[in-house]
């Protein structure tokens, strides 16, 4: 990504769209510092996905997302989020849908 759009939700969404489509992700939500507009050079990309991916297919999605944006991605599956947890609260507060079938 060029540095002027490094942390733009629109630019991140555009880069990740083909990856989500290729892996048949049902929905993806961006949350955390990039979604809040407070990201810096050391920020990672926080993404929650709703998918049927498990095991190596999930790892493949993670690797392809990181390659697409050239930054670390913290990838979570919706089935792993506990209701009422701090992560669930962060997603509820800052989450932005960036992909949906």
Question: What does each model-found stretch correspond to?
Answer:
Residues 1-27, 36-41, 52-101:
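Catalytic core of pol beta-like nucleotidyltransferases
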Residues 44-46:
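Acidic Asp/Glu-based divalent-cation binding sites
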């Amino acid at each position: 990504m060029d540095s002027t759009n490094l942390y733009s939700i629109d630019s991140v969404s555009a880069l990740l769209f083909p990856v989500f489509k290729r892996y048949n992700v049902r929905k993806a939500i961006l949350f955390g510092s990039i979604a809040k507009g407070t990201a810096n050079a050391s920020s990672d990309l926080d993404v929650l996905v709703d998918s049927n991916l498990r095991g190596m297919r999930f790892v493949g999605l993670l690797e392809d997302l990181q390659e697409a944006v050239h930054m670390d991605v913290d990838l979570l599956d919706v089935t792993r989020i506990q209701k009422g947890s701090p992560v669930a609260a962060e997603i509820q507060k800052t989450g932005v849908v960036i992909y949906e079938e």
